[in-house]
Amino acid sequence: MSEEKPKEGVKTENDHINLKVAGQDGSVVQFKIKRHTPLSKLMKAYCERQGLSMRQIRFRFDGQPINETDTPAQLEMEDEDTIDVFQQQTGGVPESSLAGHSF
């Protein structure tokens, strides 16, 4: 008998991972992406699907802004991780001046 190791649970660098993109409206869109693919591909696909412009929204992972050149591998993303989407604030008062106010 040959001693082949099971492939289960073994991660290779070319693996795809499933990422969820959660909008402020509660919607969740799932994407499958390679670990070394720039996240700009996912971001653009999300915008097209939701009818949004890249200028209108911001993507964050673990509270940190995501750059278009970032990859899941660089951000140490794992399968089923969630990216949060926020509407870009245009005009109005800066967020810092809203601190301490409840609406």
UniProtKB/Swiss-Prot annotation:
Signal peptide positions (record): none
Location in or out of the cell: Cytoplasm; Nucleus; Nucleus, PML body
GO cellular component, one term: PML body
Posttranslational modification: Polymeric chains can be formed through Lys-11 cross-linking. Cleavage of precursor form by SENP1, SENP2 or SENP5 is necessary for function.
Keywords assigned: Cytoplasm, Isopeptide bond, Nucleus, Ubl conjugation, Ubl conjugation pathway
Cross-link (Glycyl lysine isopeptide (Lys-Gly) (interchain with G-Cter in SUMO2)): K5, K7, K11
Annotated tissue distribution: Expressed predominantly in liver.
Domain Ubiquitin-like stretches: 15-92
GO molecular function annotation: protein tag activity; ubiquitin-like protein ligase binding
Principal subcellular localization: cytoplasm
Task of the protein: Ubiquitin-like protein which can be covalently attached to target lysines either as a monomer or as a lysine-linked polymer. Does not seem to be involved in protein degradation and may function as an antagonist of ubiquitin in the degradation process. Plays a role in a number of cellular processes such as nuclear transport, DNA replication and repair, mitosis and signal transduction. Covalent attachment to its substrates requires prior activation by the E1 complex SAE1-SAE2 and linkage to the E2 enzyme UBE2I, and can be promoted by an E3 ligase such as PIAS1-4, RANBP2 or CBX4.
Official protein name in the record: Small ubiquitin-related modifier 3
Lineage: Eukaryota, Metazoa, Chordata, Craniata, Vertebrata
